């Protein structure tokens, strides 16, 4: 229930009557009825109701003409494309329920600021307020267009524009240069009625695809006035320019030639914490705005989308795949591309009949399941051990630990207190690792070894730990497989 209805249920509530003399006077049921009479019956019906209700004429002639031009009846609920095609073939469409209370689509995707946005910090700099006028009050004061262009040319992080009418080519050229040359993200929100004039200005500049890749243009309307018979569409009257998240210019100045040279305007430059409400307002406007595709309206090809499968597309959204993907699209642009492909696919199958598999949902489910089918991995071929290595020497078979020591598990090599295997074989992998770790330690200094002792393989000791460098002979051991004499261990110790 509405707050006014809940307040009426309160026992202690006193319904105070707010008249036209009160400052809080805003809504009047009699004025709403007069507005409905104007839109339904014209000027004559409006004047009769005003006279009957003893109201003052609250609408000027210009407002009455503008309201009648902005009024439009509610559109009928549009069914799916296939149902619409069948309805055309069988019988004409019948009127459905109004969208005023039963909307066809209530959940819409919030457009992301995919090019980036400034961090919202507690401190935005020194708060200052500067007023500029046209014509200038001081002799050397800059004109309003100069102030705006300097802000855009000095931008380094982000540029955000909210404007009712944007037709000045010089200002837009500065925005294009900032987006193309300095890679500054640009977001522009225009009034829906001024979009066509903005596109006319863009067509005169002969823009290329790569120059507008960092520019996002969207449109919004006013709040509007909803009635049972239709809706009055409002307009966007806000005008401000935000740069780098720390300064904003607002006022009556529009980005047009007339505002710069003909009209009298004010421009208020705010810095620091004063721009916090403008930051919130811009993000709210951007969330309810509609996309204006510059590539489509200007006839530009745009970036060609890659035909990724659904599995790969889901992975590319993950930031950890950014280095692998290379030239990966921003998430917002990828979602727009997917929605565009979905609309084109829906338009191509408009006249086709539904299949036996459940229609579009069944086809998507089947495509999703097919993407998840795993492919059997092909393992690399392993070359067999050469017979020469397996041939016995001196009537004794060679242990596989000498031919392929890497495939032996660590648990299968029990070691004794001196780093040797239990069967008398030394483990060269662990001995080498232990030797290198001690050799490159900062605390161990290796003195010069006499030439008489360096030629013979010996067992070196680092910090009371022995590391055998050669094969030591143990009784009953099979370590001597070369047939040579037994190597005598040396007692060389490095302190």
Curated annotation (Swiss-Prot):
List the SUPFAM superfamilies hit by this protein, alphabetically.
Phospholipase D/nuclease
The highest taxon in the source lineage is Eukaryota
Which parts form a coiled-coil structure per UniProt? none
Q: Where on the chain is N-acetylalanine found, per UniProt? A: 2
> Subcellular localization, per the record?
Cell membrane
Entry annotated with the keyword Transmembrane helix: no
List the cysteine pairs that form cystine: none
Q: Which residues carry this modification: Phosphoserine?
A: 4, 477
Ranges for the region named Disordered are 341-362, 384-495
Oligomer status and interactors: Directly interacts (via DUF1669) with CSNK1A1 and CSNK1A1L.
| Protein known as | Protein FAM83F
Which species does this protein come from? Mus musculus
The gene behind this protein is Fam83f
